[in-house]
């Protein structure tokens, strides 16, 4: 056994021990107030009820330390207790720290820890899509599952790591591959059969306008090029269409035609949403 360097308080009133033999000495009342799990375990019962913690592990000394559940590592317990007792600085929390706090806080019914971790992970720039998906599944955060799957659809399978695949799991990875194939088929059908331009009522030269549209379409810098780029999501293509100005095409005709193309692209959203809905029923806890 060894005492933790920063989480063994000299005036602590509750000694805890993890599976690796690390001892933590913390403040019992504060711990009970923060964690529903420990509140139920450590609160003294009425006189006619048995004590939940026997004398052999009552937490009043190192030799009678309360054993912590073996579900988490010493590092994960550190992150959890650092948060609970406000030890150290988490001004710019790392994704790994936040995930550890979410996992432990969820298990120990520490609502403030769950809210803290979710709040910072939600907008964290370095929260990988595969990890977001896994955490969303494990902790029933459906919005994370959807957002992560949307992002992953735009990632070629060949670029995914073994770690990504492990985080997704077999069912989700298979659903992702099938969804990517359906999206690709839909995009290719649009690419090889470009929509006819929609002309404004006052378009003076529809034939010329159509020629300009077809010429711009076949450019790799236009819609055709965007459709064959797997790394572009449907939303990104929508944004590009809003800014795209093919040469010499009447402005109103361009807007009408791009609007129609956006409607065709919405089929991609339906494909992805259907896959996510089915997946959530299977993998979200």
PLM regions with names:
Residues 1-67, 89-90, 126-285:
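BTB/POZ-protein C-terminal extensions
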Residues 121-123:
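Long, hydrophobic, well-ordered secondary-structure blocks that form the structural core
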Residues 58-119, 199, 203, 207:
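Long, hydrophobic/aromatic-enriched structural stretches that serve as scaffold segments
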């Amino acid at each position: 056994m060894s005492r933790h360097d920063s989480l063994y308080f000299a005036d602590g009133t509750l000694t805890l021990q993890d599976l690796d033999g690390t001892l933590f000495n913390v403040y019992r009342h504060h711990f009970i107030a923060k964690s529903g799990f420990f509140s139920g375990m450590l609160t003294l019962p009425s006189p006619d009820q048995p004590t939940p913690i026997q004398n052999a592990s009552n937490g009043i000394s190192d030799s009678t330390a309360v054993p912590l559940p073996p579900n988490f590592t010493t590092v994960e317990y550190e992150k959890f207790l650092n948060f609970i007792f406000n030890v150290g600085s988490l001004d710019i929390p790392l994704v790994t720290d936040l995930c550890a706090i979410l996992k432990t806080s969820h298990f120990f019914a520490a609502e403030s820890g769950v809210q803290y971790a979710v709040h910072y992970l939600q907008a964290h720039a370095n929260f990988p899509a595969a990890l977001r998906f896994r955490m969303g599944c494990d902790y029933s955060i459906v919005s994370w599952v959807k957002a992560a799957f949307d992002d992953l659809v735009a990632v070629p399978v060949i670029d995914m790591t073994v770690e990504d695949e492990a985080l997704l799991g077999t069912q989700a990875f298979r659903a992702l591959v099938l969804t990517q194939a359906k999206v690709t088929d839909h995009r290719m059908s649009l690419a090889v059969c470009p929509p006819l331009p929609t002309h404004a009522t006052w378009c003076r030269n529809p034939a010329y306008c159509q020629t300009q549209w077809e010429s711009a379409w076949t450019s790799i810098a236009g819609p055709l090029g965007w459709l064959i780029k797997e790394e572009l999501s449907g939303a990104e293509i929508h944004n590009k269409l809003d800014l795209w100005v093919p040469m010499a095409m009447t402005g109103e005709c361009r807007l009408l035609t791009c609007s129609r193309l956006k409607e065709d692209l919405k089929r991609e959203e339906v494909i992805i949403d259907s896959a996510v809905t089915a997946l959530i029923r299977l993998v979200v806890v």
